[in-house]
Amino acid sequence: MMITKQSYQKFALMRVFVFSLSAFIFNTTEFVPVALLSDIAKSFEMESATVGLMITAYAWVVSLGSLPLMLLSAKIERKRLLLFLFALFILSHILSALAWNFWVLLLSRMGIAFAHSIFWSITASLVIRVAPRNKKQQALGLLALGSSLAMILGLPLGRIIGQILDWRSTFGVIGGVATLIALLMWKLLPHLPSRNAGTLASVPVLMKRPLLMGIYLLVIMVISGHFTTYSYIEPFIIQISQFSPDITTLMLFVFGLAGVVGSFLFGRLYAKNSRKFIAFAMVLVICPQLLLFVFKNLEWVVFLQIFLWGIGITSLGISLQMRVLQLAPDATDVASAIYSGSYNVGIGSGALFGSIVIHQLGLGYIGFVGGALGLLALFWLRFITIKFKKT
């Protein structure tokens, strides 16, 4: 009996691990253009701010596609659906690696965005389903850890590959790693019938939950602020701070490493007081942005800001997703799809705002604008916390 229990725990953990790897590769490809922005712009003889709109397009495809695509796939068995998504993901990366102009690259990114929109709509609820008993919150933490490792290893390695070879090779390697993960998924995941996915009828039901709607708006606001700055952090560090490319790569590594700390803090502190934890995470996201230009030439201070910022954004993302799942246990996939859509509205809006700031004010101002948007989000958090204190 003991061996059976141990075997169950082992396979359950391996399945959670596969989802963590999947989160790693999806987050790596979503944000790796941030690390390659200058190289892509140079190869197509374009400005970084213009190429940065590729991040906006990707995010808006995800935001518009998350809910309708999730509803269209609501009855499909989840393992089969995941393998289809990885096939689309891999083929799109092959096209990215072969892209002969910016528009072909943009088209390939749209294919990845379609896969992304469904993947993040169903993954949080699935990882909780396959997790060992009494380890549901930790499983969600491991999923977030995979996302954080994308920042620690994925982005810096993507940048290093891009520097040694070229940015096309980075996308090719991502496609290769995704193939290995898909094979693991095929081997390890059990049959996963769709469960509690929700339907189109769930949408108006969820919209009648004011705290849930307030959290979606909070996500859009704070993530818009974050990506106003983060989308252009690589050219900021190189052009404004005037640090070397190697230091820039190291700072991206530190940002991702901080995400591991954020995942750990979530696992330890979120359940004790979720409201205070979310507020604390938001402060860690906002303050480094507001002070980024002020201390732009002090290398150790910028490292510290990047580290605290990384802790904050990882803690915040996983905390808000957990809160959404808690408020919509009857329609987890629909709620997650709307969350993913809201998050990506924030990403797309932030990248667009950052581009506008660069063209109208200059690259040095992105932190001030991003931080100001974050402050508005903090005031909104305070409002919904007071209004729905008992929820």
UniProtKB/Swiss-Prot annotation:
**Which sequence ranges are marked TM in the entry?**
16-36, 51-71, 82-102, 110-130, 138-158, 170-190, 210-230, 247-267, 277-297, 300-320, 338-358, 361-381
- Taxonomically, the superkingdom here is Bacteria
The biological process GO terms on file are:
transmembrane transport
Q: What SUPFAM superfamilies does its record include?
A: MFS general substrate transporter
Q: What membrane topology does the UniProt entry give?
A: Multi-pass membrane protein
GO cellular component entries: plasma membrane
Q: Name one Pfam family in it.
A: MFS_1
Compartment(s) of residence? Cell inner membrane
> Which keywords annotate this record?
Cell inner membrane, Cell membrane, Membrane, Sugar transport, Transmembrane, Transmembrane helix, Transport
Instruction: Supply one GO molecular-function term.
Output: transmembrane transporter activity
InterPro entries recorded for this chain?
Answer: MFS, MFS_dom, MFS_Efflux_Transporters, MFS_trans_sf, Sugar_effux_transptr_put
Say which family it is in. Belongs to the major facilitator superfamily. SotB (TC 2.A.1.2) family.
Task: Provide the function of this protein.
Answer: Involved in the efflux of sugars. The physiological role may be the reduction of the intracellular concentration of toxic sugars or sugar metabolites.
Please state what the protein is called. Answer: Probable sugar efflux transporter
